[in-house]
Amino acid sequence: MTDKIVTAEEMRHYDFYTINTIGIPSLVLMERAALAVRDEILHAFPIALKDVVVVAGSGNNGGDGIAIARLLHIAGVHVTILNIGNPQHASAEHQTQEKIAQYYQIPETSDLAVLNKATLIVDAMFGIGIDRAVKGAYADAINAINNTDAVVVAVDMPSGVNTDTGEVMGTAVRATTTVTFAYNKVGLTKNDGKDYAGNVVVANDMGTYAVD
């Protein structure tokens, strides 16, 4: 266990070193991240698993979300993927996870109405990547999430919260729990970020290595 708290740039540096110098593939890190979130959901929120919706952006945080959806599906949970953003801009890892999800025939939609019946929502839109005000479909999705009574589990960071400052970038997901990877993030400990994050769980057994 470590009390280390990092910025977005530090975390990107550690990920880059792990992937490109040590040689651990990014998909391996993504799978470990997904397993950590799955375990937290299954162990902490078993009563909220009737209808789970994973809200996935087009980047690697969304790829984490799709992997989480697959793992929950395999565990017998009824899960739907709500895709937000442009799939043509999806990262390579995201595209790989999408192909696997299609193999398992996990339901997917772009209709925000699916959130209305959700008992648990996984927020996998931005992660540590947000650096500007949230607008458009992402803002609509965040506001729709916040208008539900569902348990909300954020992946790495609540979408819309700045990783370095804890500032809300226009609008942000109000999470019940945030599962953050490898190290705690500065933005989860200060300003609005500490309130929007809910209970913070640091999944530190990620295989990501710090090099300072």
Curated annotation (Swiss-Prot):
SUPFAM superfamilies: YjeF N-terminal domain-like (SSF64153). It catalyses: (6R)-NADHX = (6S)-NADHX; (6R)-NADPHX = (6S)-NADPHX. Its cofactor is K(+). Binds 1 potassium ion per subunit. Residues 11-212 form the YjeF N-terminal domain. PROSITE patterns: YJEF_N (PS51385). Keywords: Isomerase, Metal-binding, NAD, NADP, Nucleotide-binding, Potassium. Disulfide bonds: none annotated. Its EC number is 5.1.99.6. InterPro entries: YjeF_N_dom, YjeF_N_dom_sf, YJEFN_prot_NAXE-like. Catalyzes the epimerization of the S- and R-forms of NAD(P)HX, a damaged form of NAD(P)H that is a result of enzymatic or heat-dependent hydration. This is a prerequisite for the S-specific NAD(P)H-hydrate dehydratase to allow the repair of both epimers of NAD(P)HX. This is NAD(P)H-hydrate epimerase. It comes from Limosilactobacillus reuteri (strain DSM 20016) (Lactobacillus reuteri).
